[in-house]
A protein has these predicted regions:
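Short capping loops/turns at secondary-structure boundaries
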Residues: 118, 122, 173-176
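Nucleic-acid endo/exonuclease domains
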Residues: 72, 142, 176-177
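Long, well-ordered alpha-helical scaffolding segments within enzyme catalytic domains
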Residues: 79-82, 129-137, 174-186
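Hydrophobic faces of well-ordered beta-strands that scaffold small-molecule active sites
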Residues: 61-63, 92-94, 113-115, 138-142, ...
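Active-site-proximal loop/turn and secondary-structure-junction residues that shape catalytic pockets
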Residues: 67, 98-100, 117-119, 144-146, ...
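Structural alpha-beta junctions
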Residues: 86-92, 134-137, 184-194
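Conserved Radical SAM active-site core
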Residues: 1-112, 120-134, 149-154
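Auxiliary Fe-S-binding modules of radical SAM enzymes
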Residues: 1-9, 146, 151-229
């Protein structure tokens, strides 16, 4: 039985808003529906949420579920990174679609920096990530997968996630199973874990789903089991 990635990784929306402007953005629709901020194209920082990092029970966190790291002001990033350093019990993930706008170094052991790639024409983002974000851990999310990315340079990448379009737009986009399998094979040849998101079940088949996590994330999940919520 496939698992939902949201059960493994918790959203912590410290920044809400994004300037990228994807036509299929679920975050923008949610913000508009619940009126979280006035203008989604003008990101806002919510430092009060940093207290969530102080909890002792380990957790895997995604910090850019409602934003893009490229839209964070440097001072926001510095404040968040400082808090991450104080809380090594957690693992933290960041995503961007504009790695070309980033330029920083970090030695954080529990921070993972990734790019979203939806088509072959966006493969440059992986190279830009490695060049512009000098970090310990990298990941790539191939979602929603619009076409065959072909041969991908995954050197230095520590995890990949593969998924397709969800929601109202899902009927307009069809991800071929061969694309997902090609990415999986390329990653596995380099020893990179692969997580197929649950929306691939109708395409891949539940019995064929591969849902692997980095060892650091698995350790967090194992420790969680010994804690009472």
């Amino acid at each position: 039985m496939s698992i939902c990635i949201k059960d493994q990784i918790q959203n912590m929306n410290i920044v809400i808003g994004c300037t990228v402007g994807c036509t299929y953005c679920y975050a923008r629709n949610n913000v508009k529906c619940w009126h979280m901020i006035d203008d989604f194209a003008d990101p806002e920082f919510f430092p009060g949420k940093l207290k969530m990092m102080e909890k002792k029970r380990p957790q895997n966190f995604l910090l850019t579920g409602m934003s893009d790291l490229s839209g964070w002001k440097p001072e926001w990033r510095d404040e968040v990174f400082a808090k991450i350093r104080e809380n090594p019990q957690h693992q933290f993930l960041f995503l961007t679609k504009r790695p070309d706008l980033l330029d920083f170094d970090t030695d954080l052991e529990n921070a993972w920096f990734g790019v979203t790639v939806t088509r072959k024409a966006e493969l440059w983002r992986i190279d830009a990530l490695r060049k512009n974000v000098r970090a310990k851990h990298y990941h790539v999310t191939f979602e929603p997968l619009f076409d065959d990315p072909g041969t991908v340079d995954l050197s230095g990448i520590n995890w990949i996630v593969v998924g397709t379009m969800t929601g109202a737009q899902s009927r307009k986009i069809h991800t071929e199973p061969e694309w997902a399998w090609s990415l999986t094979d390329q990653a596995h040849k380099l020893g990179i874990p692969v997580f197929m998101k649950e929306d691939l079940v109708p395409i891949i088949g539940d019995e064929n789903m591969i849902q692997e996590m980095p060892e650091e994330f698995n350790k967090v999940l194992e420790v969680q089991k010994s804690w009472k919520k």
